[in-house]
Design a protein with these regions (language model features):
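C-terminal motif of bacterial Sec signal peptides marking the signal peptidase cleavage site
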Residues: 22-25
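Intrinsically disordered/low-complexity terminal segments and short unstructured peptides
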Residues: 7, 20, 30-32
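Bacterial N-terminal signal peptides that target proteins for export
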Residues: 2-13
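Hydrophobic membrane-insertion alpha-helices, especially the h-region
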Residues: 15-19
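N-terminal maturation segment of proteins
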Residues: 27-296
Length: 296
């Protein structure tokens, strides 16, 4: 789902800094490290593991060997929970972490820890502030989820056979993912925050481009088979089996999911299901608090 770019930037910086703490923070001479500094490192390590394991996709792209960081990979691969309730829980969790962060006075930290403390504080504050704007973020548009998912999956790294199985499981979950997206969009509409018709129209065009591509030129087919061919640990029979499985999932799961999403969006285009005149607005800045959202 599309997110505020500043919020995403903070998340990326925070992730890098926390991972650096795991790699280097605890490796310093322990006799020269204060008790507070050790506790701070343990706190950051715990936060790092929590953020890294949010969903299978994030975990896979961020870390090649999660177990080396003490992170247990989910038994069932998942995109994570994209519901507004989950986003609100994330904001509540950020409040809890911020209070824990404040138990570490910066005067007792090293120079590097102080920098991490400051950036983590900014990130948590950004997350907390984002709660009132949760429904302002549309899952559609130029870089919305329907166009982003094929690109993201096409870049999913195959290091071993488990990666392939996890990938196919994620492909299989695209229908459920789109159901979450439509539920979120309906919640936005019920709150009188309506995606403009031109945004929905652009999204439908993206879906048509994806559906109209030939099988050989489909990104989820072409990229999958290229990555599969580069994995030397598989036999030709295994590769053929996974290739057939992937194509079957695309035909029986992915295409119908995109068709269903397209139909749902076509129904919503131009409809007036809101209780106010917001259905005529074409920019978020025209909504109440819309300009504040962009400033945020």
């Amino acid at each position: 789902m599309k997110k505020n770019h500043r919020h995403t930037l903070f998340a990326s910086i925070c992730f890098i800094l926390l991972s650096g703490t795991i790699l280097f923070g605890c490796g310093q001479a322990s006799t020269q490290t204060s008790l507070k500094q050790k506790k701070f490192d343990r706190f950051l390590n715990s936060c790092f593991r929590e953020y890294a394991a949010e969903n299978t996709v994030t975990l896979h792209f961020k870390l090649s060997n999660p177990s080396a960081y003490g992170i247990k990979t989910p038994v069932s691969p998942t995109y994570g929970d994209l519901s507004s309730d989950a986003l609100k829980k994330n904001c509540s969790r950020s409040k809890e972490l911020l209070q824990k962060l404040y138990t570490f006075p910066t005067s007792s930290l090293t120079k590097k820890q102080k920098l991490t403390w400051q950036i983590f504080q900014d990130y948590l504050n950004e997350t907390i502030m984002s709660e009132k704007y949760i429904l302002y973020s549309s899952p559609f548009g130029a870089d919305g989820l329907p166009s982003d998912i094929p690109v993201t999956l096409s870049e999913y790294r195959f290091d071993n056979e488990k990666d392939i199985k996890d990938y196919l499981s994620l492909v299989n979950q695209i229908p459920e993912l789109f159901t979450q997206v439509l539920d979120f969009e309906e919640e936005r509409r019920n709150a009188d925050i309506v995606s403009p018709d031109f945004v929905i129209s652009d999204t439908i065009d993206q879906i048509n481009q994806f559906l109209n591509a030939s099988e050989e030129n489909n990104l989820l087919v072409e990229s999958f088979e290229e990555r599969l061919d580069s994995l030397d640990t598989l036999s030709e029979d295994q590769k053929a089996s996974y290739t057939a499985n992937n194509r079957l999932l695309i035909t029986n799961k992915v295409f119908p999911a995109y068709e269903h999403l397209k139909t749902a969006l076509q129904v919503s285009t131009g409809s007036k299901h809101t209780t106010s005149d917001n259905s005529t607005k074409e920019r978020l800045c025209e909504y109440e608090n819309g300009q504040d959202y962009y400033r945020f």
